[in-house]
Amino acid sequence: MTGFFYFCTMKKTFKPGTMIYPLPVVMVSCGDSPDTYNIITVAWTGTICSDPPMCYISIRKDRHSHPIISRTKEFVINLTTDALAKATDWCGVRSGRDHDKFKEMHLTPEPAQVVKAPLIAESPLNIECKVVEIKELGSHDMFIAEVVAVNGDEKYFDPSTGLFQLNQADLITYSHGKYYTLGEKIGKFGFSVEKIQHKRKK
């Protein structure tokens, strides 16, 4: 058929599964008193609404943090970095039933602004959340939450603009069982339709 081109790629079909990668990997801190503080590493997390700011985490019922967050209805999402990679992984493969994760990973619990759950001081950005709904889905329960405060490490603020430079924090991501650092910037939001500014000749 003249004027039409057919391009076929060879695709292999997988069984249904979670293949949306890469993902953020975060340490979620919870508990309302020092004797109940715990950290769980979560990759099933993300933003679900801008206004009001809302996010979610999904946790298996048998995880130690599940009943803690179900009871307190709050948690803190702590972004993770290259320097925190070992602690991030360790907090995901060890149980708070058997370990004091803050102590054993040399992490510092810090008071939050709104919630009783602690911040992780070593994290560059801490997002305080209050649970508004728990949805039972299957292997995991989804904790839908409203963001009630955000705390950023002062060293990442640009003194001249006051903007928070998260790109300087060496954040890590998770993809199919492995951790990665982020690569180089390839564009910015809207760059595909941005008009090129030509300098006028003098």
What is the predicted role of each segment?
Residues 6-202:
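Basic, polyanion-binding surface patches
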